[in-house]
């Protein structure tokens, strides 16, 4: 997925480069020059390296572990920049909507944070556990819990889940994730819709050999290929349960029947939303959500500067306020970092996104690996870090896999952490060996203030190594339309990508599978390496998550050391702040922001 709200659609990344990250003017000089010594980054990375486990029935039993000092009651004010475009689970794929969904929707599985809010386990949410695989991971069986109901009091049964998944094949759903649909159909892209083009709305159903509900409590998925990541995928908000009885098709997107601890009392698009308790939610069935707060009053159109100013002021209703997604803006970030009182009310962590400089392997001049290695060693990453706010907004990336991904291991084959300004001497030697000193490089960059800044700095570093760099701007609104073309004219250009769930299976295949090369796809460097392609097929068949994570890390190392089609630049981070009257404020590594489920009013 991409940084702007989490959409996979490639065009959305351009919004981050245009300023959506917001942290663009502070940090004391960026990589190599900031006062930040990286200790907090190392702590965050260490906590996020832990392998996410798949929980059993005991781990999936509610209620959620209590938060120390928490009490029930009160109202929390929530300042959001953007209104919610989608409330139908099937259409939810952006981070702000996912945060909301964690309060109002439930699925078969979900992420349970430990008492500190740091480690996570995939547990059964509406199901009794994280799933039972059979047939080598091609079949997964889920049993529903007792006492689970929608907000209207209707019991949740397997028929609702059949309806939930079948409607995803129809044109009612156009914006959400498509992993499970594609797996069930065993078809790439939008071809999955052919399996059930009208969804369940004209009386047709998926065959029992694909999706079976033999009784009211059992849901069975049948895949043609092993799907060891299914518990991860089902934990996405986009696969939360939809009421078969209450489905209003397109209208459901504005007024869904909820299943979480809250229901929507009122929603005025672009203005406000009020959440109140769902009296039919049973905490004994829920191992994930504490739901201490009685009411959430959400208002929209709060730019980062506005929400930061209000929360820093900590007066009136601001004392019991926060934002699920808004970050501390650039102007106030240094203030929050410098003031002990403000710092105590802030949380921070990595987001799932990794920046990378792509080397276009379709270009004849770039087929020489010595030239590619020269680019990799020469490229300075410090201009990119500085452009997006310095060390508080970005950490130097040594690898292609984010610290938020389960099983992450540190990597830095090009020595960027030791030499963020690049190593032009080593690069020039490689260029001399290749006989390519003075070689022209066409550098396509996004035409934003940040793009201007980092491309200038990076170009200077490449020139020191002996490249003739020609910078060419690309309009921000069409940036990813342009660079995702197979025959684009650029030798190097920057992109960013984040895992859809904490597994590198949502990083390596979409970005580096040579069989995915086509206009609009995300294999931006157009790498088509037989070993990588074979490894992708092999690892996708591994059902042991820890073993798969180890193997994905090996592919990461191979790509960087033997293929050299990309150069990692930065791991994205963010800082958020809450009013002093709010307790239970923790940074959730999966949501990539404050966890709404643990909050309470002091």
Specify the residue positions occupied by each region the protein language model found:
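Long beta-strand-rich cores associated with HINT superfamily self-processing modules
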Residues: 44, 576-602
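Extracytoplasmic/peripheral linker and loop segments enriched in polar/acidic and small residues
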Residues: 62-65, 69, 212, 470-479, ...
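Alpha-helical secondary-structure segments
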Residues: 77, 156-166, 216-224, 260-261, ...
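N-terminal lobe/hinge region of extracytoplasmic solute-binding protein
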Residues: 77-135, 257
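Gly/Pro-rich hinge or "lid" segments in bacterial periplasmic/extracellular proteins
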Residues: 113-117, 193-195, 204-206, 216-218, ...
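Surface-exposed binding/hinge segments that line
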Residues: 143, 160-162, 167-242
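Extracellular/periplasmic solute-recognition and catalytic clefts
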Residues: 265-276, 297-363, 386-387
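Structural transition elements
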Residues: 392-430, 450-453
